[in-house]
Swiss-Prot record:
One of its GO terms (biological process) is cellular response to iron ion. It comes from Yersinia pestis. Belongs to the ABC-3 integral membrane protein family. Its main location: membrane. This is Chelated iron transport system membrane protein YfeD. Keywords: Cell inner membrane, Cell membrane, Ion transport, Iron, Iron transport, Membrane, Transmembrane, Transmembrane helix, Transport. It comes from the Bacteria. The keyword Transmembrane applies. GO terms for cellular component: ATP-binding cassette (ABC) transporter complex; plasma membrane.
Amino acid sequence: MNMLFSLISEPFAYPFMQRAIVAAIVTGVVCAILSCYLVLKGWSLMGDAISHAVLPGIVLAFWLGIPLVIGAFVSGIFCAVATGYLKENSRVKEDTVMGIVFSGMFAFGLVLFSRIDTDQHLSHILFGNMLGISLTELKQTLWIAGFTLLVVLLKRKDFMLYCFDPNHARVIGLPVKFLHYGLLCLLALTIVASLQAVGVILVIAMLIAPGIIAFMICRSFDQMLVVATLVSVVACVLGTLISFHIDGATGPCIVIIQALFFVVALIYNHIKPIKDRKMAPLTKAVNPENTAPSNLP
């Protein structure tokens, strides 16, 4: 027990680990909340596209001497808008357009990076460097994540209805176009906030895994938000602590933990129906008047 306590408490003695844990929790919360909407909307590939497309914006921002988050955000929004325009003005399907746009922008970013002299490691951009996050970068992450969470919470029901049934949202008078591009902007902001933690490649796992895990084991969207947040925060904290002890990359450790949680949820999702079928005759015998299935909101 003392050894376990030492393993958990030892990293907190270092200031860089304190910053890393705070960044992990904040990143985990904002990614988990947004992942529920992405899973409900079916935008897994959109998150992947924008996360890869921010690379040229980061490189150009560094070259111009402006904050990297501005370049990343503009680049991500350009990818989303270009994808929507090409989809609406051509016969090509959306997933095909996204594949071409994000791969082209990612390749363009790699070429730009190879032509610019910088002491910045490409691996830190691609895979993140949470243990090396500075106080300024942490404050930046907190501001972006806080703004994103505030907007999502204020428009929670509107976004939920838009993701679940955009036609119904349009019929009742919701600004569907505004919600569409608003969600894209929030997605781009979330990716920017997560860059320091897991980089442009692995951020898609944090934007999908918590939501799909919660989707498999929950019966309502509110439950889904809570479970996704818990899963994401636990995975981020555990991954950060494990990376400290094994001297490994933080981003991949976090994603591995989330992948393990997904396997557990998948097994639970297969076992629960079997258990319910076995318990059904016993439940009916004990309480024959209350055998109707429940419909949770």
